[in-house]
Every structure is written in C-alpha cells, then in structure tokens.
C-alpha cells in the first residue's frame, strides 16, 4: 500500500526543477482536505450547515461550510511558508501571505464546490490549482501571478467527499487517485494514470434550464436522447449538481459534463480560474477534452479573478460533438 506522501516523493524526480517545495505544498493541501473531511462528517452536529447570511463577490449566498473550508485550507497553506498567496472563490481579492515573498507558488481554489448539496448529504468537493508565480521572487505577489492561462498550471486536483473521500491530482504526468483511510489518517493510492474510457455514454447537465440554453446545446441534448445503435445512443442522463462529483463519475464511467451559457449568465456560470482550468488540466491528462464550446479552456487568457465561462468537459468525442453542434446552430 502506497500513501500519497510516498507517491509524491517518488514522483518528485519527474521535475528537473523540483526542490521539494511543490511536494510540501501538495502535503499542505492534503492536510486541509483531512480537516475538511473530518468536519463535513460531523457538520450536522456542530452548527456549520446552512447559509451563513453573507454573500461572496459574485452575489451568491455563502454556506457556513464554504467559509469554514476556505479558512481551514487557507490556514494549512499559510502554515508551510511555501505559498506566496492564494485566490479563492470565497475571497473578493487575492490574499497575499506576508513573510512568504520568497515562495515560488500561488494557489487558486474552490474550497467547497457544490456546498448547497451538503444539507442533503450529497457529495461535495474541493478544487485546487497551482501556478509558478511570474513576478520576481522576493517581492509580494500581485494579481498578475494569478491571471495566467490554464496551460501554465504546475499541478491541479480535487478532493471528493462522498461515500469515501478521494484526492485526485495531476502534475502534468498523468492523473492519480488516492482514497482516504480514516483509521490510519492517510490517503492511499487506489488508481494510477487514470484515463477516460474510450467511449462515453453519459451526459451531465441541469436540464431544468433547457429553455435558456443556446440552440446548439439544445440540439446536442436531443442528439443524446435519440436512439441509434451505431453510436450507442440514447445516452444516459446523470446530474448530481456538484462539478467534482459529476466530473469524477464521468472520468470513471465515461461521459461529458456541460454547463453552457444562459440568458442570465451569457458568459457562463462556472469560474474559469477556480473550476474550469483545474478540471480541464485533469481532463486532458486523462485523455479527455475541455472547451467553452469554441475554444480550448486551457488557452483562454484570464481577464479577472472571478471570470466565468461556459464549460464542456469529458470524453474527447463527446466534447467535439457538442462543439460541432454549437458551430452548426449559432444563436441569432
């Protein structure tokens, strides 16, 4: 049985520039995940369920667990002195860690994705993304360090808190998964070099918003529902409402996750930096594809910390199909 810590150290040789800092950074994220796992499991007992009464910068009501997870993960990263600063879905601006100007890395994170599901005991997750800073080491980080395209990511991953807690990550050399053993307090390797199945037959989308979708997406959904033995349709519809949980299932079983633009969110709803980029990096490393319907997600140049984007991620052939429908049926 190989632990996450042992695996990270073993793989450190894959980076010619490695000095151990990235290893320590991933270890800090691992610690934060353990703390969040522990408290999610007793959330109903310690009054951290439900809305906090506050709103984030996007105007969304923050759940108590959103704020709790944000603070715990931020503290775990700050304690190691190896991160120069963070950007979080729950923070209006970047957080600069004083005294860490020497650090080479910055972290972007969605501390608790799908937190509105926690009250009904549905799987939620943590998403993280790591970049090497672009401003000079020895100076405080600036927003420039965080507004990098996804193809500059050094590492990315997620933790899914479900029937078991799993941490899945990539450093650009494949996707690896670890299951948390609470009796030992360690993450143990369960799948190395994960890949999307060759063919997917599941589509994940909130069809309650169907009337608001672009024409090309509507046509694709109808295509998924049509019967055709040659392409193994109709596809199965599965939607949890938690990006991490939906992506994880599709990674294992094969499928596509869709979150298109709507009239109320013409640019899309998911955050490019905190959700789309890290999941796109993982998808490509697992042999899949991620797009906004027209452009590769990892090539998009961010313009703001909380920028949103349409998001289609999963099996190559399925993402290509939805891109073709969007191109063939443009909205007027």
UniProtKB/Swiss-Prot annotation:
InterPro entries: FBPase_C_dom, FBPase_class-1, FBPase_N, FBPtase, Fructose_bisphosphatase_AS. It is found in: Cytoplasm. It catalyses: beta-D-fructose 1,6-bisphosphate + H2O = beta-D-fructose 6-phosphate + phosphate. Belongs to the FBPase class 1 family. It is an enzyme of class 3 (hydrolase). Pathway: Carbohydrate biosynthesis; gluconeogenesis. GO terms for molecular function: fructose 1,6-bisphosphate 1-phosphatase activity; magnesium ion binding. Substrate binds at residues 113-116, 206, 239, 257-259, 269. Homotetramer. Binds 2 magnesium ions per subunit. Its EC number is 3.1.3.11. The gene is fbp. This is Fructose-1,6-bisphosphatase class 1. GO terms for cellular component: cytosol. Signal peptide: none annotated. Mg(2+) 1 binds at residues 89, 110, 112. GO terms for biological process: fructose 1,6-bisphosphate metabolic process; fructose 6-phosphate metabolic process; fructose metabolic process; gluconeogenesis; sucrose biosynthetic process. The keyword Metal-binding applies. Keywords: Carbohydrate metabolism, Cytoplasm, Hydrolase, Magnesium, Metal-binding. Mg(2+) 2 binds at residues 110, 113, 275. Its cofactor is Mg(2+).
